[in-house]
Structure formats: C-alpha cells, structure tokens
Amino acid sequence: NADKITLESMLNHTSGLGDYVGEHYHKLFKKPVGNKAILDTIKAQGVEFLPGEKTRYSNSGYYLLSRILEKVAKKPYNVLLKENITGKAGMKNTFSVLDHPTNVFKSYENNGGN
C-alpha cells in the first residue's frame, strides 16, 4: 500500500501508518536511537488501514515527512524549522531538541500508576 500513501495523507493523518512512538516508546526511547531504528519500527508496523479510509494520529507520518523535507532541501530538519518557521516568526526561545539536547524535559508517560 506504500504506493497509495501521499504527502497529503501523511499531513492529514489518513495514510494508514501506525504511530512508532505509541507502544514502542519504551523500546525506542530508553536511550538515543538513530533513524534506522525508527524506520525499522515504522516498516515493521506496516499500515493499520488503507490510505484515505480513516483518520488516526500518526507520528510515523510526520517523521517520514521530516525525512522527505531533509532529502529535498538537503538540510537537517532542525535547520529547516529555524529558517522557515521559528526564525521568521521571531520565536527565539523555541527550538528543536537537536539544537539544545541538554535542555530537553522528559515527556510524561504512562507507567501504570507508579
């Protein structure tokens, strides 16, 4: 079904792709991981429904969109964000984790009430 997934369907969460962050959060984010681990997880998940059939939030789609932007622009995603969004909007205190990795607050997570 990959040939049926479009940029638009990834943008509006109708691609059918799963969410690599969801149930794989603990496996992927205990330590820093590279693009290969994330791509392998997305590939292993496959699709949950045919593109256009449903709407479901997908970090996987947005991750793939960021990789596509990097390939087309030949620049890292964090640089593209700064040049095209945060810089133009004057958002001096908004940044990518790649710009300041030591200033990142750990997200909340479901740990079964513990």
Positions of PLM-derived features:
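Short, surface-exposed loop or secondary-structure junction motifs
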Residues: 2-114
